[in-house]
From Swiss-Prot:
Stretches with biased composition (Polar residues): 118-127, 199-210
Organism from which the protein derives: Xenopus laevis (African clawed frog)
Record domain PDZ: where: 248-333
Gene3D superfamilies, alphabetized: 2.30.42.10, 2.40.240.130, Winged helix-like DNA-binding domain superfamily/Winged helix DNA-binding domain
Lineage, opening ranks: Eukaryota, Metazoa, Chordata, Craniata, Vertebrata
Identification of the protein by name: Segment polarity protein dishevelled homolog DVL-3
Length: 717
């Protein structure tokens, strides 16, 4: 009797293995090789000769197939199946009775399934086989002692006894089901049940869909004592996943413009394996229904069954049905997601954000009153939004439920409600081109939120137009500052919403004389008293006063003067708009003192007026030192007189009406903000520095005139 040498390579190992089969080379089969090798979880590729390609590696899976032989030996490559991690040993087989052999799959819906597919209900067993494309079978055993009697006469599968299967409908028991999912290799499943056979696949009468198990590690059992009648499950999948869950969804296409699904076809060498839901688009009929999910298997559309239908035909039929008017009925088999996303995620209404230490400290300080209150109303409190990390000043009683939103509401109110943590808008960190966008939201979510929470929109298009107006107004902002609104883009809340912490709604008291005035002022002088950060209303700046070139230069007053100029100071500092005629009358009543400074107050210290007075003084043969002394004395007298009169303007803020160079010196602040530098009265400044300081202020007030006067002085004009 001849023998055959078989050289086989195992996976990626460099050194091949050699076994000898006691069978002649012309009669050796794959079953003979498997009996010697006993490696059930491998694919077998043999060196073969093809007429078109020459020497190739041919996969052989039929145990009765003869092996190709070259020079009296067989060369084989063993490749482990994907996801297969089995131990060596034999697998227990059914030894109950002779069953008809499995029906060969002819291609159809049950031919191939993605690993995430799982059924949840039981149905009839019509037109159903229990063998998948990987030759996986289900067997049952009632009595263990019969194994030795029949195992020698049974055919072999993967080096183990292959018993003929019995077709029977039966229930499931969690303690008796053995499951494995060697998708790409020849394997089988057995079950120890007393009264019924555990089925690996089943279907309903209308779908005849088979189920493909998720790939799992299969452990082969060692022979047990005869008295053990049951065995526990080797799989982590419970019996609730062993049944097929089929749902029928009827969609009303009159309310929606499109179906909103993408389909994926599954195919293999034996034919097409069915149509599956690839993705679901927002705004479609399927997304609005919510019961169909990605990965579900599409079994039937209206009255058209997709069984034994190719993928191309199924797509064509589905396209024709969608184009027809009327409702659409979809019958799908639910899938089982191996990586659920919603089990351990937080609900949308309670988003969690990383702790911002600065916001935490400021919030705690505001609650405990550590910082001085700069115009905070007692009914106001600082609330940190967890959804958008925006620190905004809103009343304690103002919550999302209190907002009565309509299309006539202010945009600020709508955006404030949208940014609330209880609004329902999904605001979280997003990834875009590997860039993390903190606290972002999708444009389509904004449109949906506006359409459902703001009254007055007749359709979704109006809500989208309103969202576009929010973008143009700056209440929401694109990550790259695009001004065109798109529902597929990410957006964040704009600066107008983020800077609400700077708003102050308190009314100023009348102690400073500004209770009846509307003023717009810059930040106060460091030595001045604290002033509110912002105002409720903003008025346009008044037009600066500019005398006609033909008129003589008026005497611009910086502070209070003598008793005769008290009315002039009070009216100007309070911001009243006096006409130029009244100003000229005041100067006429003051006599000729305006030539030397205007009734004892500080005269115009711009460079232009200073140079003109110097030239006039030289013509009258008045010493410059006398003019300088008189001018400094006027400054000191002006400061002293300023403290004797009532101030009618905000501290440290220039009057709004009059020439642009009018400016009052800041009074001495009794109480300054924390950390402010100590201030010094202008009267205590040395005389040689006072004039320079005032001249610098005048030059900064109107630098163009300063430049012209310097040019004139240089050329002696």
């Amino acid at each position: 009797m001849g023998e055959t040498k078989v050289i086989y390579h195992l996976d990626e190992q460099e050194t091949p293995y050699l076994v000898k089969l006691p069978v002649p080379a012309e009669k050796v089969t794959l079953g003979d090789f498997k009996n010697i090798l006993n490696k059930p979880n491998y694919k077998f590729f043999f060196k073969s000769m093809d007429d078109d390609f020459g020497v190739v590696k041919e996969e052989i899976s039929d145990d009765n197939a003869k092996l190709p032989c070259f020079n009296g030996r067989v060369v084989c490559w063993l490749v482990s199946a994907d996801g297969s991690q089995s131990d060596a040993g034999s697998v227990c087989a059914d030894i109950q009775s002779d069953l008809p052999p499995p029906i060969e799959r002819t291609g159809g819906i049950g031919d191939s399934r993605p690993p995430s597919f799982h059924p949840n209900t039981r149905g009839s067993q019509e037109n159903l086989d229990n063998e998948t494309e990987t030759d996986s079978v289900v067997s049952a055993r009632r009595e263990r002692p019969g194994r030795k009697e029949t195992s020698e006469h049974a055919t072999r599968i993967n080096g183990t006894s292959k018993m003929e299967r019995r077709r029977d409908t039966g229930g499931y028991e969690s303690s008796s089901t053995l499951m494995s999912s060697e998708l790409d290799s020849t394997s089988f499943f057995d079950s120890d049940e007393d009264d019924s056979t555990s089925r690996f696949s089943n279907s309903t009468e209308q779908s005849s869909a088979s189920r493909l198990m998720r790939r799992h590690k299969r452990r082969r059992r060692k022979p047990k004592a005869p008295q053990i009648e049951r065995s526990s499950s080797f799989s982590s999948i419970t019996d609730s996943t062993m049944s097929l869950n089929i749902i029928t969804v009827t969609l009303n296409m009159e309310k929606y413009n499109f179906l909103g699904i993408s389909i994926v076809g599954q195919s293999n060498e034996r034919g097409d394996g069915g149509i599956y839901i690839g993705s679901i688009m927002k705004g479609g009929a399927v997304a609005a229904d919510g019961r169909i999910e990605p990965g579900d298997m599409l079994l039937q559309v209206n009255d058209t069954n997709f069984e034994n239908m190719s993928n191309d035909d199924a797509v064509r039929v589905l396209r024709d049905i969608v184009h027809k008017p009327g409702p659409i009925t979809l019958t799908v088999a639910k899938c089982w997601d191996p990586s659920p996303r919603n089990c351990f995620t937080l609900p949308r209404s309670e988003p969690i954000r990383p702790i911002d230490p600065a916001a935490w400290v400021s919030h705690t300080a505001a609650m405990t009153g550590t910082y001085p209150a700069y115009g905070m109303s007692p009914s106001m409190s600082t609330i940190t939004s967890t959804s958008s990390s925006i620190t905004s000043s809103i009343p304690e009683t103002e919550r999302f439920d209190d907002f009565q939103l309509s299309i006539h509401s202010d945009m600020v109110t709508i955006v404030k409600a949208m940014s609330s943590s209880e609004s329902g808008l999904e605001v979280r960190d997003r990834m875009w081109l590997k860039i993390t966008i903190p606290n972002a939201f999708i444009g389509s979510d904004v449109v949906d939120w506006l359409y459902h929470h703001v009254e007055g929109f007749t359709d979704r298009r109006e809500a989208r137009k309103y969202a576009s107006n929010l973008l143009k107004a700056g209440y929401i902002r694109h990550t790259v500052n695009k001004i065109t609104f798109s529902e597929q883009c990410y957006y964040i809340f704009g600066d107008l919403c983020g800077n609400m912490a700077n708003l102050s709604l308190n009314d100023h008291d009348g102690s400073s004389g500004t209770s009846d005035q509307d003023t717009l002022a810059p930040l106060p002088h460091p030595g001045a008293a604290p002033w509110p950060i912002a105002f409720q209303y903003q008025y346009p700046l008044p037009h600066p006063y500019s005398p006609h070139p033909g008129f003589p230069d008026p005497a611009y007053i910086y502070g209070g003067g003598s008793a005769g100029s008290q009315h002039s100071e009070g009216s100007r500092s309070s911001g009243s708009n006096r006409s130029s005629t009244e100003k000229r009358k005041d100067r006429e009543t003051k006599g000729g003192d305006s030539k030397s400074g205007g009734s004892g107050s500080e005269s115009d210290h711009t460079t232009r007026s200073s140079l003109r007075r110097d030239r006039a003084a030289s013509e009258r043969s008045v010493p410059a030192s006398e003019h300088s002394h008189r001018s400094h004395h006027s400054i000191a007298h002006s400061i002293r007189s300023h403290h004797t009169h009532q101030s009618f303007g905000p501290p440290g803020i220039p009057p709004l009406y009059g020439a642009p160079m009018m400016m009052m010196p800041a009074p001495v602040s009794v109480m300054g903000p924390p950390g402010a530098p100590p201030s010094r009265d202008l009267a205590s400044v040395p005389p040689e520095l006072t004039a320079s300081r005032q001249s610098f202020r005048m030059a900064m007030g109107n630098p163009s005139e300063f430049f012209v006067d310097v040019i004139k002085e240089f050329w002696g004009v």
